[in-house]
Amino acid sequence: MSRIAKRFAKLKAENRAALVTFITAGDPDHATSQALLDGMPAAGADIIELGMPFTDPMADGPAIQLAAGRALAAGGSLRQTLEMVEAFRKTDAETPIILMGYYNPVYAWGAEKFAADAAKAGVDGLIIVDLPPEEADELVPFLRQAGIDFIVLTTPTSDDARLPVVLANASGFVYYVSIAGITGTASAAQSAIDEAVARIRRHTGLPVCVGFGIKDPAQAAEVARVADGAVVGSAIVSVLADNIGKPGAVSAPLALVKDLAAGVRGARN
């Protein structure tokens, strides 16, 4: 059983959703980013998404675009991202880590080699924002071979006709993008999220996590009542950005993670 499957089985037994946190690898620098990553599980993150810094993060809003810029300026790279996962695994063998980003760096690395190297580093899943389902076959077989889950994105426009195509190669969990837009901007109405989660569940037995637009513990709790996971990224990245160069550079975002975790854990009580 994969680390992701084990984590969701554990959460199901506890009758609660996952808090899935996102940070950009190498933001604002390697050491700070590593400390933040390493501190996430103790603060309450159940699953961690680590953004692969890229020059043109088109699906991301201002907060994550700026984070990618800071990471790249500080020498961030795909190699460094894998090294961060490797370092994390020295102290944590249980928390799933998912790499999230764009296909270009993976393609340049070589799909087969990337899958093998990512698995060796301790990566559990991969989300590629700009790889259409119709083209995923050039990557998915190598991920399967390496034991890495391919996590697909579904959106408000993924209807019953489209979902089987989108979900064809899915494993690990399904990520529902709750707004038709970029990360960290507007928030979707809870009723629309409820309907979308129900629709996706008609097509798959995989857990469904909801992200884009979740900014605080109350919103995370709302989502966690219905979905199998609440994904928070821009809010954490923004708090980190506000504290760069201060003593609270790591402790402030981890305090937010702790509050988000409390919201998610109390959602179904």
Curated annotation (Swiss-Prot):
It catalyses: (1S,2R)-1-C-(indol-3-yl)glycerol 3-phosphate + L-serine = D-glyceraldehyde 3-phosphate + L-tryptophan + H2O. Its EC number is 4.2.1.20. The active site is at residues 49, 60. GO terms for cellular component: cytosol. InterPro entries: Aldolase_TIM, RibuloseP-bd_barrel, Trp_synthase_alpha_AS, Trp_synthase_suA. Pathway: Amino-acid biosynthesis; L-tryptophan biosynthesis; L-tryptophan from chorismate: step 5/5. PROSITE patterns: TRP_SYNTHASE_ALPHA (PS00167). CDD domains: Tryptophan_synthase_alpha (cd04724). It holds the Pfam family Trp_syntA. Keywords: Amino-acid biosynthesis, Aromatic amino acid biosynthesis, Lyase, Tryptophan biosynthesis. GO terms for molecular function: tryptophan synthase activity. The keyword Membrane does not apply. The alpha subunit is responsible for the aldol cleavage of indoleglycerol phosphate to indole and glyceraldehyde 3-phosphate. Belongs to the TrpA family. Tetramer of two alpha and two beta chains. This is Tryptophan synthase alpha chain. It comes from Paramagnetospirillum magneticum (strain ATCC 700264 / AMB-1) (Magnetospirillum magneticum).
